[in-house]
Structure formats: C-alpha cells, structure tokens
Design a protein with these regions (language model features):
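A short SAM/SAH-binding and catalytic strip from SAM-dependent methyltransferases
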Residues: 107-121
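A short glycine-rich, Lys/Arg-flanked "PGG" loop and its adjoining helix->strand segment in the class I
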Residues: 122-136
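Conserved class I S-adenosyl-L-methionine
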Residues: 30-38, 138-159
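Short conserved loop adjoining the S-adenosyl-L-methionine
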Residues: 97-102
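Conserved alpha-helix/loop element of class I SAM-dependent methyltransferases that forms part
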Residues: 11-30
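Class I SAM-dependent methyltransferase SAM/SAH-binding core
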Residues: 48-96
Length: 160
C-alpha cells in the first residue's frame, strides 16, 4: 500500500483519531455507524475501540476510485485485510438518505466530513435520519479559522 508523507505525520493523525474516539466514549462491543468514512482513518480507531465483539459500519458517498494518491478502494481493501478488518463493513457509493438500514446502532459518527455536504439542508436530513437509527450522534470537524500563516494555503484549498 502506498503511504503519503512521513510516518511521524501519520502517527500524529492516528493519535488525533484515537483521541476523538476516546472523547466519543466508544466502548467494547458497541455497534457504530460512521458517515463519511473516506480512506478509513477514523474507522480504524473506531474498530480498535469496539474490540472483537463490536462492529463498525462505515459508509461514504464517494466511489472506490475517489482520492489521491490513495483511493478509497485501495485504503478500504488494505484495512479489510488487516487484523481488525472483520469488525468493519465498508459501503462506498452509498447515500445514507436512501440506503436501507435494518439495524440499530449505539452511536453514529461524523468525523471531519461535514464540509463535504454541499447544502445545509442535506446535512440536516442526515442528522434527522441518524436520530432514528442511533442512540447518540458524535461530530468532529476541523476548525476553519487559521491561526498561523503556514495554515493559510490549506484553509484556502479547503474553502474552494
């Protein structure tokens, strides 16, 4: 599998995700629904937290070929082949508003994905449906205020 950037950056990103999961009070044995899983950065932390008796349903509206330099397909295949892969089900090209959900979840997670919603009304529709299938909803999003000059380029690219 391809890697991007230095391993120290990857460790920092993983520590961030592990901290989020801890703040969400994810426990062993929980059933978690993750909206906007992307390449699975938060998914991996969730799967670790729920343990062998838990389950993570990770969905994303993007397809397997989305993402560079690592696509969602490459990333999710790699995760599924890992020791925690049996705790996760990925559903890509899935629109949560139209997909069939027959099971209840302990918690729904939206981690760093809100800015992909083009309309606030769509996000509101997601949240209303999530209330019906999950006991709790946890949200984490990047702060869009830059505080250091070196953050400005990323801020502008994210704002497009």
């Amino acid at each position: 599998m391809k890697t991007v950037g230095s391993s120290s950056i990857q460790r920092i990103q993983l520590q961030h995700r592990l901290g989020l999961v801890q703040s969400f009070n994810i426990e062993k044995g929980m059933r978690v629904l993750e909206i906007g899983c992307g390449q699975g950065d938060t998914t991996v932390a969730l799967a670790d937290a729920v343990g062998e008796t838990g389950f993570v349903m990770a969905i994303d509206i993007a397809g397997r070929d989305y993402g560079k330099p690592i696509t969602l397909g490459e990333a999710t295949d790699f995760i599924k082949s890992s020791p925690i892969g049996n705790r996760i089900s990925f559903d890509l090209e899935a629109d949560f508003l139209t997909m069939k959900i027959d099971e209840a979840y302990d918690v729904a997670i939206l981690s760093h994905c809100l800015w992909y919603f083009q309309e606030p009304a769509t996000l509101l529709s997601y949240l209303k449906r999530l209330k019906k299938v999950a006991k709790r909803i946890c949200i984490a999003e990047w702060d869009l205020e830059w505080t250091k000059p070196e953050q400005l380029a990323h801020f502008y690219s994210a704002s497009i």
